[in-house]
């Protein structure tokens, strides 16, 4: 990925951006902080990648990005540390996924995700510090490492311009999880699209080097992970890329830029990322329900499962053909997740776009319950008042309590 190929497949720096994003606030900075100890040719290469990112993305950095160059081992250690910061949520999610038959009993979710991200993350952007953390082997950046740098620089650039990190952090803090997943699809899709534009400008030799290097990446943990874990990891990059490209085709970079402020207020949903034509058109139904108190259990979470949530659970257990048909009619939902330190309980209330959609989801969840939920656990699927209720619990009396509360 050399500088000479940077403009191929890119856009004019005025494209889709207003005056505040195309005029550099400080046009004089020519050095990047934190890389003074690197060889001069590497410093020059990093600065060139910054300028390439600006040109491809049609935006400019408000201030110089902070770049930390680490070894592969240091990168993995930092990724593992980030995963461990979220460790408080893992036991409850581990129990829920096992109750739903998505995770084998011998698998420890925290260990799986720590190993998976340690294996798969090639670099990351830390929104709290504004820092890019990327690896470099001796002798400079490889083709894949340059591509990764473009991706992470795009995150830094768009966060400076649109403050996406604080928006997404608020969504997670407020348990707006499907909305956060959709917004993450925009963020990762944007960066992946910019990275793709960069790759399109490479020579055949450089592309050969890229694919050869990419094929050597160890994916042992990814390949052995449950399908719903793999799909969840890939979603913001894969579906997000299609979403970002759809926005770009409709309105150039301006449409992508505008989505950063539009999606939080819609609200956005994974349905809109999966089907970009639904963006700003098919808004989620707000499904309301009274909170149920379960003796000995804490309410771990109330949120929205979302179309993507239904897709990954149904795809793994019943196959993608069933998952696609059943989840495509998603109108809205709400779910409650309880945990007592060992056992999980789950209530999911779903509304379809049409009565037929509701029946299709009911049929799918009945099959799912028979196939995935253990015989000794409680599971119940029923439609009432145009809502579909799916209840599962490790302890049968707890499941009965939830059902009784739903039946009034």
Question: Which functions belong to the PLM regions below?
Answer:
Residues 132-150, 179-182:
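Short pre-active-site segment immediately N-terminal to the catalytic Zn-binding motif
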Residues 159-211:
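Post-HExxH zinc-binding segment in Zn-dependent metallohydrolases
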Residues 53, 147-164, 191-192, 244, ...:
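Active-site recognition of the HExxH zinc-binding catalytic motif
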Residues 1-23:
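Ser/Thr-rich, Pro/Gly/Ala-heavy low-complexity intrinsically disordered linkers and tails
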Residues 62-83, 171-175, 209-220, 263-264:
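Acidic helix-start/capping segments at beta-turn-to-alpha-helix junctions
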Residues 43-134, 138-142:
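Auxiliary, metal-adjacent structural segments of Zn-dependent hydrolase domains
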Residues 220-343, 349:
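Pan-zinc metallopeptidase signature
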Residues 331, 339-408:
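C-terminal soluble interaction/assembly domains
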């Amino acid at each position: 990925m050399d500088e000479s190929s940077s403009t191929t497949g890119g856009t004019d720096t005025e494209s889709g951006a207003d005056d505040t994003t195309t005029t550099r606030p400080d046009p004089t900075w020519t050095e990047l902080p934190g890389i003074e100890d690197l060889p001069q040719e590497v410093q020059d290469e990093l600065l060139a990648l910054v300028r390439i990112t600006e040109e491809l993305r049609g935006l400019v950095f408000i201030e110089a990005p902070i770049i930390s160059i680490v070894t592969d081992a240091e990168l993995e250690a930092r990724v593992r540390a980030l995963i461990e910061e979220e460790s408080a949520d893992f036991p409850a999610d581990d129990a829920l996924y096992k109750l739903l038959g998505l995770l084998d009993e011998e698998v420890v979710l925290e260990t799986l995700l720590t190993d998976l991200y340690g294996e798969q993350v090639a670099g990351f952007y830390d929104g709290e510090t504004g820092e890019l953390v990327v690896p470099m082997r001796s002798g400079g950046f490889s083709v894949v490492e340059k591509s990764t740098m473009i991706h992470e620089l795009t995150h830094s650039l768009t966060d400076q311009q649109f403050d996406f990190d604080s928006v997404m952090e608020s969504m997670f803090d407020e348990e707006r999880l499907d909305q956060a997943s959709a917004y993450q699809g925009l963020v990762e899709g944007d960066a992946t699209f910019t990275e793709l534009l960069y790759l399109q400008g490479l020579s055949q030799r450089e592309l050969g080097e890229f694919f050869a290097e990419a094929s050597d990446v160890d994916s042992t943990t990814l390949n052995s992970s449950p399908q719903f874990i793999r799909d969840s990891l890939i979603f913001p990059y894969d579906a997000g890329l299609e979403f970002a490209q759809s926005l770009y085709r409709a309105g150039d970079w301006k449409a992508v830029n505008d989505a950063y402020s539009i999606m939080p207020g819609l609200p956005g949903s994974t349905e809109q990322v999966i089907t970009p034509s639904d963006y700003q058109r098919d808004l989620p139904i707000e499904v309301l329900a009274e909170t149920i108190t379960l003796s000995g259990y804490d309410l771990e979470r109330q949120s929205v499962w979302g179309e993507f949530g239904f897709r990954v659970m149904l795809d793994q257990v019943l196959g993608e053909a069933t998952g696609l048909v059943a989840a495509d009619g998603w109108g809205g939902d709400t779910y409650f997740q309880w945990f007592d330190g060992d056992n999980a309980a789950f209530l999911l209330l779903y509304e379809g776009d049409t009565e037929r959609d509701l029946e299709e989801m009911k049929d799918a969840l009945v099959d799912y319950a028979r196939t995935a939920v253990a015989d000794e656990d409680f599971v119940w699927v029923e439609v009432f008042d145009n809502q579909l209720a799916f209840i599962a619990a490790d302890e049968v009396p707890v499941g009965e309590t939830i059902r009784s509360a739903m039946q009034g």
